Amino acid sequence: MRVLVYILFSISFVFSQWFEINYGGISRSYYVAYPPSSSEPSGLIINMHGFGGTASGQIAVTQMNNYAHPQNLAVVYPQGSASGIGTSSWNIGTFWDFNDQDDVGFISAMIDEIASNFQINLNKIYACGFSNGGYMSYELACELSDKITAFGSVSGNFMLNS
Protein backbone atom coordinates (compact mmCIF):
# COMPACT_ATOMS: atom_id res chain seq x y z
CA MET A 1 0.00 0.00 0.00
CA ARG A 2 2.83 2.42 0.84
CA VAL A 3 4.38 1.83 -2.56
CA LEU A 4 1.09 2.61 -4.32
CA VAL A 5 0.66 5.85 -2.34
CA TYR A 6 4.25 6.84 -3.14
CA ILE A 7 3.77 6.13 -6.86
CA LEU A 8 0.51 8.10 -7.04
CA PHE A 9 2.03 10.99 -5.10
CA SER A 10 5.08 11.03 -7.38
CA ILE A 11 2.99 10.96 -10.55
CA SER A 12 1.11 14.09 -9.50
CA PHE A 13 4.40 15.99 -9.40
CA VAL A 14 5.29 14.86 -12.91
CA PHE A 15 2.11 16.38 -14.29
CA SER A 16 1.81 19.43 -12.02
CA GLN A 17 4.65 21.83 -11.40
CA TRP A 18 5.86 25.42 -11.33
CA PHE A 19 7.66 26.91 -14.30
CA GLU A 20 9.46 30.19 -14.88
CA ILE A 21 9.91 32.16 -18.06
CA ASN A 22 11.95 35.29 -18.60
CA TYR A 23 9.72 37.82 -20.30
CA GLY A 24 10.28 41.56 -20.58
CA GLY A 25 13.49 41.28 -18.59
CA ILE A 26 11.87 39.78 -15.50
CA SER A 27 11.25 36.24 -14.34
CA ARG A 28 7.56 35.31 -14.47
CA SER A 29 6.10 32.15 -12.95
CA TYR A 30 3.13 29.91 -13.63
CA TYR A 31 1.83 26.58 -12.38
CA VAL A 32 0.75 23.91 -14.86
CA ALA A 33 -1.59 21.08 -13.80
CA TYR A 34 -1.72 18.57 -16.66
CA PRO A 35 -4.27 15.71 -16.68
CA PRO A 36 -2.34 12.62 -15.52
CA SER A 37 -4.19 10.11 -17.69
CA SER A 38 -4.24 12.07 -20.94
CA SER A 39 -3.53 10.03 -24.07
CA GLU A 40 -4.34 12.78 -26.57
CA PRO A 41 -3.56 16.52 -26.66
CA SER A 42 -5.33 18.40 -23.88
CA GLY A 43 -7.14 21.69 -24.00
CA LEU A 44 -5.71 24.45 -21.81
CA ILE A 45 -7.49 26.72 -19.32
CA ILE A 46 -5.65 29.87 -18.23
CA ASN A 47 -7.00 30.64 -14.74
CA MET A 48 -5.97 34.10 -13.44
CA HIS A 49 -6.15 35.48 -9.91
CA GLY A 50 -7.61 38.81 -8.92
CA PHE A 51 -5.88 42.02 -7.81
CA GLY A 52 -3.64 41.26 -4.84
CA GLY A 53 -4.13 37.53 -5.30
CA THR A 54 -1.67 34.80 -6.16
CA ALA A 55 -1.53 31.82 -8.48
CA SER A 56 -1.33 29.55 -5.41
CA GLY A 57 -4.42 31.17 -3.94
CA GLN A 58 -6.29 30.74 -7.24
CA ILE A 59 -5.40 27.03 -7.25
CA ALA A 60 -6.76 26.61 -3.72
CA VAL A 61 -9.92 28.69 -4.15
CA THR A 62 -11.08 27.46 -7.55
CA GLN A 63 -9.97 23.81 -7.32
CA MET A 64 -10.39 23.86 -11.09
CA ASN A 65 -8.13 20.83 -11.64
CA ASN A 66 -10.84 18.61 -10.13
CA TYR A 67 -13.25 19.66 -12.88
CA ALA A 68 -10.84 20.17 -15.77
CA HIS A 69 -8.78 16.99 -15.67
CA PRO A 70 -11.69 14.55 -16.22
CA GLN A 71 -12.52 16.61 -19.35
CA ASN A 72 -8.92 16.29 -20.62
CA LEU A 73 -8.14 19.92 -19.87
CA ALA A 74 -4.87 21.17 -18.43
CA VAL A 75 -4.99 24.25 -16.20
CA VAL A 76 -2.31 26.92 -15.94
CA TYR A 77 -2.27 29.44 -13.11
CA PRO A 78 -0.02 32.38 -14.03
CA GLN A 79 1.29 34.77 -11.38
CA GLY A 80 0.59 38.46 -11.96
CA SER A 81 3.43 40.92 -11.54
CA ALA A 82 3.99 43.31 -8.66
CA SER A 83 2.16 46.57 -9.08
CA GLY A 84 3.38 50.03 -8.23
CA ILE A 85 1.54 49.77 -4.92
CA GLY A 86 3.25 46.52 -3.94
CA THR A 87 0.64 43.90 -4.76
CA SER A 88 0.21 41.54 -7.71
CA SER A 89 -2.03 42.49 -10.61
CA TRP A 90 -2.62 42.20 -14.35
CA ASN A 91 -1.93 45.17 -16.61
CA ILE A 92 -5.01 45.57 -18.78
CA GLY A 93 -4.68 49.31 -19.35
CA THR A 94 -7.53 51.65 -18.40
CA PHE A 95 -7.67 52.27 -14.65
CA TRP A 96 -6.02 48.89 -13.90
CA ASP A 97 -2.59 49.95 -15.17
CA PHE A 98 -0.92 49.53 -11.78
CA ASN A 99 2.08 47.83 -13.35
CA ASP A 100 3.93 48.47 -16.58
CA GLN A 101 4.43 44.85 -17.61
CA ASP A 102 3.29 43.47 -20.96
CA ASP A 103 1.00 40.83 -19.45
CA VAL A 104 -0.64 40.01 -22.80
CA GLY A 105 2.81 39.28 -24.23
CA PHE A 106 3.71 37.23 -21.16
CA ILE A 107 0.56 35.10 -21.46
CA SER A 108 1.19 34.60 -25.19
CA ALA A 109 4.78 33.49 -24.55
CA MET A 110 3.56 31.25 -21.70
CA ILE A 111 1.06 29.53 -24.02
CA ASP A 112 3.84 28.90 -26.55
CA GLU A 113 6.14 27.54 -23.84
CA ILE A 114 3.46 25.21 -22.44
CA ALA A 115 2.61 23.97 -25.94
CA SER A 116 6.28 23.12 -26.50
CA ASN A 117 6.49 21.12 -23.24
CA PHE A 118 3.08 19.42 -23.13
CA GLN A 119 0.65 17.95 -25.65
CA ILE A 120 -1.78 20.85 -26.00
CA ASN A 121 -4.65 21.14 -28.47
CA LEU A 122 -4.10 24.68 -29.73
CA ASN A 123 -7.75 24.88 -30.83
CA LYS A 124 -8.91 24.55 -27.22
CA ILE A 125 -7.28 27.35 -25.23
CA TYR A 126 -9.56 29.10 -22.76
CA ALA A 127 -9.04 32.11 -20.48
CA CYS A 128 -10.84 32.78 -17.22
CA GLY A 129 -10.25 34.77 -14.09
CA PHE A 130 -11.62 36.47 -11.03
CA SER A 131 -11.90 40.27 -10.69
CA ASN A 132 -8.69 41.75 -12.18
CA GLY A 133 -8.03 38.27 -13.65
CA GLY A 134 -11.51 38.41 -15.18
CA TYR A 135 -10.71 41.76 -16.76
CA MET A 136 -7.54 40.13 -18.09
CA SER A 137 -9.56 37.32 -19.68
CA TYR A 138 -11.46 39.96 -21.70
CA GLU A 139 -8.15 41.55 -22.66
CA LEU A 140 -6.75 38.21 -23.83
CA ALA A 141 -9.90 37.41 -25.82
CA CYS A 142 -9.44 40.68 -27.72
CA GLU A 143 -5.65 40.87 -28.00
CA LEU A 144 -4.93 37.14 -28.51
CA SER A 145 -7.98 36.20 -30.54
CA ASP A 146 -5.71 34.03 -32.69
CA LYS A 147 -4.95 31.87 -29.62
CA ILE A 148 -7.91 32.14 -27.22
CA THR A 149 -10.91 29.97 -28.17
CA ALA A 150 -13.30 31.21 -25.48
CA PHE A 151 -13.21 33.07 -22.18
CA GLY A 152 -15.14 33.58 -18.97
CA SER A 153 -14.97 36.23 -16.29
CA VAL A 154 -16.09 36.17 -12.68
CA SER A 155 -16.62 39.61 -11.14
CA GLY A 156 -14.70 41.43 -13.85
CA ASN A 157 -16.32 43.32 -16.70
CA PHE A 158 -15.16 44.62 -20.06
CA MET A 159 -13.25 47.90 -20.02
CA LEU A 160 -12.46 49.95 -23.11
CA ASN A 161 -8.95 51.33 -23.42
CA SER A 162 -8.98 55.01 -24.25
Regions found by a protein language model. Give the residues of each.
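Generic enzyme active-site microenvironment
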Residues: 47, 77
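Alpha/beta-hydrolase active-site loop
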Residues: 96-119, 139
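Active-site glycine-rich loops that stabilize anionic/oxyanionic intermediates
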Residues: 49-54
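A domain-start/cap signature at the N-terminus of enzymes
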Residues: 14-44, 56-62, 66, 70, ...
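Cap/lid segment of the alpha/beta-hydrolase catalytic domain
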Residues: 79-102
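A general structural-boundary detector
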Residues: 3, 19, 55, 93-94
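Sec-dependent N-terminal signal peptides
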Residues: 3-16
